[in-house]
């Protein structure tokens, strides 16, 4: 039986367990896992901050090699997905396509029946998370074949933050030459910088910490960086100096810190746009001034939740095309086996790693990517 790192409950050490292999139904497939990311969401899961059906197998964004498929399994182009293909997949599954959010609002990330690999499936349901030697692709899971020229490590280096950032940058409706501030220098923020740069941003300011992450943001395309060690008022003054006294056209909050939302409202120019994609769990409230920061400034503010299939599809193509220009691969600073999954969580929580990944089959990674 394949092994998996199982999260049995809040703040409990993960356990490596045998998980039965599935009997593949028609339209199902089995992946042999190459990489599965360790996301900030996994830390929140471990802290018990999301309502999930423990025990679970974490790992919601993963890359694997197709080991078996039953019947015809195809991607959206109609091309068969076959043994040996390297794929990723949309972690959100079982959206109903029959509710208000799916059909009227056309916002499937809000479907109340959706299930998510690595989050809302129990380990008792089977190999439905990426921190395992194998992952069960249930019928209907939307897979994306990675182009042959794309190193899987490049894609997983972006990971969940890659598709979240693409969604957020899309929501800015960025015009060529507009100024952007990205608040947060973690995985989501780094990819926000990369995609804003590729979208033609003019002045592109990364705000965050520590300094090595800000230097990395410059490699992703930031034209200026501001450290959190600088007081908020001085950061505001610096942004205004860089933007003719106005503030930036768009701000993307990608930090998860409530205070960053308040700062975003200060940094944006009158009539600008603010996208909030970092507040995935409840980190507490923040006080704002509705008149001065919202109404009088005539700004737009939008929340950005998760990602859709189109973001995964485009992210695979974009990392294949621009992966040598944007150092997503180098974001993977630490790789861990299943036995060291607890250390992986600590590395992400302590921010000693920009991106940590689980490699359940290290020998397969070496043979595939050597």
Where are these regions (language model features)?
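Short acidic-hydrophobic, aromatic-tinged amphipathic segments that line or gate anion-handling sites
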Residues: 224-230, 333-340
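C-terminal substrate-binding/catalytic core of Rossmann-like NAD(P)-dependent dehydrogenases/reductases
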Residues: 236-241, 245, 282-332, 343, ...
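Short Gly/Pro-enriched turn/cap motifs at secondary-structure boundaries
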Residues: 20-21, 53-59, 122-127, 134, ...
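Cysteine-cluster motifs in flexible loop/terminal segments that predominantly coordinate metals
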Residues: 39, 90-144
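Mid-domain Rossmann-like dinucleotide-binding core that forms the NAD(H)/NADP(H) cofactor-binding site
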Residues: 133, 145-231
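Glycine-rich beta-strand-centered segment in the early N-terminal region that forms part
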Residues: 22-36, 49-100, 147-148
């Amino acid at each position: 039986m394949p092994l998996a790192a199982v999260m049995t409950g809040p703040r409990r050490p993960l356990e490596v367990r045998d998980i039965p292999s599935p009997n593949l139904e028609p339209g199902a497939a089995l992946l042999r896992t190459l990489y599965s990311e360790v996301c900030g969401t996994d830390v929140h899961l471990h802290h018990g901050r999301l309502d999930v059906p423990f025990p679970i197998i974490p790992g919601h964004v993963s890359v694997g090699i197709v080991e078996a498929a039953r019947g015809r399994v195809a991607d959206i182009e109609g091309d068969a997905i076959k043994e040996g293909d390297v794929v990723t997949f949309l972690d959100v599954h079982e959206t109903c396509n029959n509710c208000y959010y799916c059909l009227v609002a056309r916002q499937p990330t809000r479907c109340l029946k959706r299930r998510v690999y690595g989050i809302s499936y129990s380990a008792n349901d089977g190999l439905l998370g990426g921190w395992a030697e194998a992952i069960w692709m249930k019928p209907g899971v939307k897979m994306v074949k990675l182009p042959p020229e794309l190193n899987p490590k490049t894609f997983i280096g972006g990971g969940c933050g890659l598709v979240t950032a693409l969604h957020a940058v899309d929501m800015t409706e960025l015009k060529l030459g507009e100024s952007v501030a990205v608040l947060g220098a973690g995985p989501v923020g780094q990819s926000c910088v990369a995609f804003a740069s590729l979208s033609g941003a003019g002045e592109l300011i990364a705000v965050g910490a520590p300094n090595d992450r800000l230097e990395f943001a410059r490699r992703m395309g930031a034209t200026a960086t501001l450290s959190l060690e600088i007081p908020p008022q001085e950061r505001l003054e610096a942004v205004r100096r860089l933007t003719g006294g106005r503030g930036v056209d768009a701000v993307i909050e990608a930090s998860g810190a409530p205070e960053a939302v308040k700062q975003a409202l200060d940094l944006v120019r009158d009539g600008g746009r603010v996208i909030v994609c970092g507040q995935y769990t409840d980190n507490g409230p923040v006080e704002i001034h509705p008149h001065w920061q919202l109404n009088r400034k005539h700004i737009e503010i939008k929340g950005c939740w998760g990602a859709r299939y189109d973001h995964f599809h485009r992210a695979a193509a974009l990392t294949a095309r621009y992966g040598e220009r944007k150092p997503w691969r180098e974001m993977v600073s630490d790789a861990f086996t299943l036995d060291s999954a607890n250390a992986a969580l600590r590395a992400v929580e302590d921010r000693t790693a920009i991106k940590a990944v689980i490699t359940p089959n290290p020998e397969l990674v070496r043979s595939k990517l050597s």
